[in-house]
Regions:
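Short, Lys/Arg-enriched N-terminal segments with co-localized hydrophobic residues
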Residues: 1-8
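Local sequence-structure signature of Cys/Sec-based thiol-disulfide redox active-site neighborhoods
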Residues: 8-32, 36-41
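Thiol/selenol-based redox catalytic cores and closely related redox-interacting motifs
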Residues: 41-121
Length: 121
């Protein structure tokens, strides 16, 4: 999809079908006629490269953590691991990641962020 200035939007939405915010993100892009690729995190998840790029884009792995995730044991474990192990543990346990993750090339957001997406257009 091309916009003013010739910028191309290549939107990927990472989330699950049960996530209310993921559904809202899909609706936001559909209403604006912006094509996107939906990746179900329960089926596929993020590759390590995608995970690392999202971490860089949002200011670190800690921005991705869903503090209200159901897996309280792994959530607690994250706090006690060495810093070098924390990102690896989060990557291995993607059910702890806030949804949706929306990527546009090197840009990314965590959660429902229509104000940020508006700036991409």
């Amino acid at each position: 999809m091309y916009f003013a200035g010739g910028m191309t939007m290549n939107i990927q939405i990472f989330g699950t079908s049960k996530s209310f915010d993921t559904k809202k993100a899909q609706r936001w892009f559909k209403e604006r006629g912006i094509k996107f690729q939906m990746i179900d995190m329960k089926e596929k998840g993020m590759s390590r490269g995608e995970f690392d790029n999202v971490c860089r884009a949002v200011g670190g792995w800690a921005q991705l953590v869903d503090e209200s995730a159901k897996d309280k044991d792994t959530l607690a474990l994250l706090q006690w691991l060495d810093e070098s192990q924390q990102a690896d543990k989060l990557f291995e346990n993607q059910q702890l990641i806030r949804q949706p993750i929306v990527r546009n090339g090197r840009l990314a957001t965590v959660g429902y962020c229509p104000d940020a997406w508006e700036k991409w257009a």
